[in-house]
Design a protein with these regions (language model features):
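Active-site cofactor/cluster-binding pocket
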Residues: 2-201
Length: 201
């Protein structure tokens, strides 16, 4: 995408406790089963697709910063802009990784684990969904209604989550980017919800 770039690289956390290698999920008999964190051995990559003014750049900064300072991970973030005008397309990229694996690239995220779409109009742009695999997750902001036809381009095994971030933000006196980050942490528990809430405060 043409345009400028804002970068905010964060390195290894200093003085932070290492992130837990596993989380747990409930089982049918009421117990719990260990679930390996996706950042234990590799990078976990997120791409925020947005338009200027909706807070995607801030969301990326907060997420990467919280990962480094509060979760004991490595993290890096930068954004690219179609132009500096409000309402122009914005892409915000976040890479997270284990504390012992430095992040040495600032290349755009082309094969994301997660795509978060801040405005459903961006589904009309073919590159918005580019790179999402069958193991990936799409989170998109839209009111309740019929499924957008553009989602038919996704692999059938990809996870798709719709959230009416604007409605929730109004009801909770919050911001849509905070709602979308909360949705992200609900799906991926290694992004500790409490930690993100503290970072957003």
């Amino acid at each position: 995408m043409a345009g400028g770039r804002k970068a905010g690289r964060a390195g290894k956390a200093h003085g932070a406790k290492p992130a837990a290698a596993v989380t747990t999920k409930p089982t049918a008999n009421g117990g719990s089963q260990a679930e390996e964190s996706p950042v234990q051995h590799r990078f976990f990559e997120i791409r925020f697709e947005s338009i200027g003014g909706l807070g995607a750049h801030a969301a990326g900064q907060i997420l990467a910063g919280a990962a480094v300072l509060r979760m004991g991970l490595n993290g890096a973030h930068f954004s690219s802009y179609g132009s500096e005008k409000k309402g122009s397309p914005v892409r915000s990229f976040v890479r997270l990784g284990p504390a012992n694996k430095p992040i040495r690239t600032s290349a755009p995220v082309e094969s994301p684990d997660v795509i978060v779409i801040f405005h459903s109009v961006l589904l009309n742009i073919p590159t918005t969904l580019a790179g999402l695999t069958g193991q990936g997750t799409l989170i998109y902001n839209a009111p309740a209604g019929s499924c957008p036809p553009e989602l038919a381009r996704l692999p059938k095994t990809a996870k798709v989550v719709r959230v009416d971030a604007l409605k929730i933000a109004v009801e909770e006196k919050s911001r849509p980017n905070a709602v979308l980050m909360g949705t992200l942490s609900a799906i991926f528990p290694f992004l500790t919800p409490k930690v993100l809430l503290e970072a957003l405060a």
